[in-house]
C-alpha cells in the first residue's frame, strides 16, 4: 500500500493532474481512510524531490528580496484559508463526491492554456498584485481534484509570464505550503516512512515530464486525462 501511495503521490504531485484528488479516489476505491494529514506527509517526499531538481534555480531566485517578498505574498492566501477551514477541507478527503467537479475545473484551466499566447514577463519583475493573484489561485488547490501545479503554472501563463518563469515560481511557491502541511501531517498522520521515499523517487520523474511539457507549450494535453478521471470519479462515486 505504501508503495502504491508513494508512486501515485510522486507522479501526480507535479504533473498537473492533482495528487490529492487521485489519493482521495484511491482511498475510496480501496476502502481505506486517507485524510488530509496523511496526504500532507506524502508531500514531504515530493518536497525533497523539487528542491533537488530545481536547486540551482531556487538558490539563484532566493538571492532576490523581491522574489522572497512575492513568495510571502503568494503563500498567505492558502495559508490563511487552510488554517481557517482546516476541518472542512479535511472532510473533502473522505468522499469522492466533489471530485468530478474539481477534476473538471482542472481540465478546463489546462485546456485554456492552449489558446493563451506566450508572454515575456519575468519572475524577477513580478508585481505584488500578480503574486497575490497566483497565491489566490493556489488556495483552490487545497481542494482534492484541483492541481496545484496546474492552476499556478496556468495562472502565470495567463498573466503572460514565460513558461520557464511560471514553472520556476510554481516550484518556489510549493515549498512553504507543502512544508507546513507536511509538518502538521507528521503529528496527525500514520503513513510510514516508505511512502514518502517512493513519492520522492517518482516525483523526480514527474518533474522532468512537467518541465518538458511546459517548455514545449503542451501542458494543455493533460486536460484530457483530468477529464477522464473526472468521469471515472463520477462513475465510482
From Swiss-Prot:
InterPro entries: UppP. One of its GO terms (cellular component) is plasma membrane. The chain crosses the membrane at residues 38-58, 65-85, 92-112, 126-146, 166-186, 191-211, 217-237. Disulfide bonds: none annotated. Its EC number is 3.6.1.27. Keywords: Antibiotic resistance, Cell inner membrane, Cell membrane, Cell shape, Cell wall biogenesis/degradation, Hydrolase, Membrane, Peptidoglycan synthesis, Transmembrane, Transmembrane helix. One of its GO terms (molecular function) is undecaprenyl-diphosphatase activity. It is found in: Cell inner membrane. One of its GO terms (biological process) is response to antibiotic. It is an enzyme of class 3 (hydrolase). It catalyses: di-trans,octa-cis-undecaprenyl diphosphate + H2O = di-trans,octa-cis-undecaprenyl phosphate + phosphate + H(+). It is a multi-pass membrane protein. Its main location: membrane. Bacitracin is thought to be involved in the inhibition of peptidoglycan synthesis by sequestering undecaprenyl diphosphate, thereby reducing the pool of lipid carrier available. Catalyzes the dephosphorylation of undecaprenyl diphosphate (UPP). Confers resistance to bacitracin. Belongs to the UppP family. HAMAP family: Undec_diphosphatase. This is Undecaprenyl-diphosphatase. It comes from Thermotoga petrophila (strain ATCC BAA-488 / DSM 13995 / JCM 10881 / RKU-1). The gene is uppP.
